[in-house]
């Protein structure tokens, strides 16, 4: 049953571009693409994970901690606040946060009037060849959050978080109407023949379909080489950013090499009606899910 006489439409956008290791160049590129998305009618615009520079987590280097900045008065966040206010758009802004002795992979949510609605700190921190984030980041302490923006209540999580269905469900249970996942993912340095892009996309398509919400994923492109004590480490980021609809269908997608500005429009009231009528939240049995609070399945 569709909502009688009501339409609450929102246009979302996913950006995709290659990063250099120069902050000013990358932030300028992000601003240029935000403006392009706005020109296409976008209301909420997602920039990829840690877009200020190279994905430095390929290597464990002490000097890379200098890239972290405090959340308060962060220059890139401040610039994006001005841009959001000028254009009247919502912009989640990914950054490497320094908080006293802690460091986080964080994202600030900027509303359409330039207001900073707060931050989410990445909860799931990966640790593997080429993705050595545990060296740099503390586990996030914010928990999964939703943010009431001008256009929608949104849930935002970061990269490795996207592989966990519990994160998506937690955000939608709190009222998230759209899920956003900024990402930095590509080839595996230890196995250049391993290509996870289809798996990556299908996992998130499942989150969209299981929760009956649209989902926006933004990834970078290009080859990045980081010098390590054992020689250069290289990742080719595979892009393929996409927007999924509430049944998990892909409604907009980028390729693996090109800069892109994806847009898609959704009627949130119609989706809410379908989510309610489908029954996946009505028929939940939280009393049976206590096993999810364990690491090994033993209660």
Swiss-Prot record:
* Magnesium as UniProt keyword: no
EC main group:
hydrolase
Q: How does activity depend on pH?
A: Optimum pH is 8-9.
Please name the pathway: Amine and polyamine biosynthesis; putrescine biosynthesis via agmatine pathway; putrescine from N-carbamoylputrescine (amidase route): step 1/1
- A Gene Ontology molecular-function term? N-carbamoylputrescine amidase activity
Q: How does activity depend on temperature?
A: Optimum temperature is 40 degrees Celsius.
**Enzyme nomenclature, EC number:** 3.5.1.53
Q: Which reaction does it catalyse?
A: N-carbamoylputrescine + H2O + 2 H(+) = putrescine + NH4(+) + CO2
In which domain of life is the source organism classified?
A: Eukaryota
So where's the catalytic machinery, residue-wise? Answer: 49 (proton acceptor), 122 (proton donor), 159 (nucleophile)
Question: Where would I find the CN hydrolase domain in this sequence?
Answer: 10-268
Tell me yes or no: is Hydrolase among this UniProt entry's keywords.
yes
Q: What Pfam families does the database record attribute to this sequence?
A: CN_hydrolase (PF00795)
Q: What transmembrane ranges does the database entry give?
A: none
Q: Which InterPro entries match?
A: Aliph_Amidase/BUP (IPR050345), C-N_Hydrolase (IPR003010), C-N_Hydrolase_sf (IPR036526), N-carbamoylputrescine_amidase (IPR017755)
**Any one Gene Ontology BP term:** putrescine biosynthetic process
Checking SUPFAM superfamilies in the record gives: Carbon-nitrogen hydrolase
Q: Which UniProt keywords apply?
A: Hydrolase, Polyamine biosynthesis
Q: Which NCBIfam families match?
A: agmatine_aguB (TIGR03381)
What this protein is reported to do is described as: Involved in polyamine biosynthesis. Catalyzes the hydrolysis of N-carbamoylputrescine to produce putrescine and ammonia.
Q: So what family is this one in?
A: Belongs to the carbon-nitrogen hydrolase superfamily.
Cite the record's note on assembly: Homooctamer (isoform 2).
Q: What is this protein called?
A: N-carbamoylputrescine amidase
- Organism (species): Arabidopsis thaliana
Q: Which gene encodes it?
A: CPA
